[in-house]
Swiss-Prot record:
Homotetramer. The record marks Y47 as: Increases nucleophilicity of active site Cys. GO terms for molecular function: thiaminase activity. Its EC number is 3.5.99.2. The active site is at C137, E208. Keywords: Hydrolase, Thiamine biosynthesis. The keyword Zinc does not apply. Pathway: Cofactor biosynthesis; thiamine diphosphate biosynthesis. Coiled coil: none annotated. This is Aminopyrimidine aminohydrolase. One of its GO terms (biological process) is thiamine diphosphate biosynthetic process. It catalyses: 4-amino-5-aminomethyl-2-methylpyrimidine + H2O = 4-amino-5-hydroxymethyl-2-methylpyrimidine + NH4(+); thiamine + H2O = 5-(2-hydroxyethyl)-4-methylthiazole + 4-amino-5-hydroxymethyl-2-methylpyrimidine + H(+). Substrate binds at D44, Y141, Y167.
Amino acid sequence: MTFSTEIKEAAQPIIEEIYNDGFIQDLLKGDLDAQAVRQYLRADASYLKEFTNLYALLIPKAPSMKDVKFLVEQIEFMLDGEVEAHEILADYINEPYEEIVKEKVWPPSGDHYIKHMYYHAYAHENAAYTIAAMAPCPYVYEVVAKMALDDQNLNRDSVTSKWFDFYSTEMRPLIEVFDNLLDELTANCTEQEKKDIKESFLQSTIHERNFFNMAYINEQWNFGGDKNA
């Protein structure tokens, strides 16, 4: 079993929890609350900006020029391509996407997730740590989307079904590159290093769950009441 396969199998129970949580289940049925959509889109817009910065940090550590080229292409996709999925959700609540994301948010769960990835980018020379922290993002979306497309409860009459259609295919090239890089970059790692890299992957999978839930509950910072706002 390859290392990338091992860590993805270990993450499956967490992904099952993500799928069964309120955000995905309501999205599946086409009745996700509009404020949850707004919170998700605003937080994800901030998240994706930082994700592109993390790609830039990976470029000097990339093993080959082919990998560098792919990372540059992914920066372009993050800036333009993934907006398509966001616009599907904006259409669902009948609000312009650009208007929704004018309001910037930085909720606790998004903050913790981003800092987790930046930590590994700066703390470890081996890019495997950072890739392991980033890889659950595309992987979770693909698995959840494919699960939804096989679910008889998927509301095909709702525009939200197109969100699942998008993520069922569009993440595949990135997942394959991340898998190959993880297998290559961990080939000579010690067992302890592999354990730490695996933990980075699993922690990010939990961060993915928290991120969806953050939108679902409209998570905010609580500094002790309105007087400290």
